């Protein structure tokens, strides 16, 4: 089923956020700034709603100056392309930005925090279906920006609607 109206995109972004919040490894990487985030307890659903939703996994595209103490994931709808005269979107592009303070890159693991976060997002979304749309494809990423305090990687996914 295709996106017939832009109003449906917000609902589907909420479904993507719900899928990301269900990934306990991702939540631990974002919530605990210690070098051992996987040794920490998983948050309950209530704690996730209070501490993670719209704080560390966001739909809103703006990150405030006071939000740089932890890693943050922001999800945005980038575009929706129509197919000629077809009023339905054929392709919806979703961007996932991962903001990670440089002081939190190194953790007690064989990997680095921003790449673990990117990997968990990819595992949560790649080849999964979102109701009302199609299968999520992609996971390509690039460095969006780097400052003296924080890095931002952008990962893109495409949701292809089938007739």
What do the PLM-derived regions correspond to, one by one?
Residues 1-83:
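Small/polar-rich, solvent-exposed N-terminal microdomains that initiate assembly or binding
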Residues 63-74, 104-126:
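Acidic, Ser/Thr- and Gly-enriched intrinsically disordered low-complexity segments
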Residues 1-5, 105-106, 142:
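Residue-level detector of alpha-helix boundaries and kinks
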Residues 27-28, 112-163:
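Acidic-leaning, charged glycine-interspersed low-complexity segments
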Residues 73-104:
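Active-site-adjacent structural patch at catalytic or cofactor/ligand-binding sites
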Residues 67-69, 86-90, 147-151:
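Solvent-exposed loop and beta-edge segments used for protein-protein assembly and interaction
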């Amino acid at each position: 089923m295709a996106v017939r109206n832009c109003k449906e995109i917000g609902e589907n972004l909420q479904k993507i956020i719900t899928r990301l919040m269900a990934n306990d490894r991702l939540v631990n990487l974002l919530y605990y700034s210690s070098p051992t985030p996987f040794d920490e307890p998983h948050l309950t659903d209530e704690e996730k709603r209070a501490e993670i939703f719209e704080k560390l996994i966001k739909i809103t595209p703006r990150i405030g100056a006071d939000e740089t103490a932890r890693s943050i994931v922001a999800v945005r709808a980038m575009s929706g392309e129509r197919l000629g005269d077809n009023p339905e979107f054929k392709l919806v592009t979703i961007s996932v930005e991962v903001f990670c303070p440089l002081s939190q890159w190194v953790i007690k693991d064989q990997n680095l925090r921003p790449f673990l976060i990117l990997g968990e997002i990819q595992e949560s979304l790649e080849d999964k279906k979102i109701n009302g749309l199609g299968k999520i494809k992609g996971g390509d990423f690039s460095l969006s920006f780097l400052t003296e305090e924080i890095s931002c990687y952008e990962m893109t996914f495409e949701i292809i609607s089938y007739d």
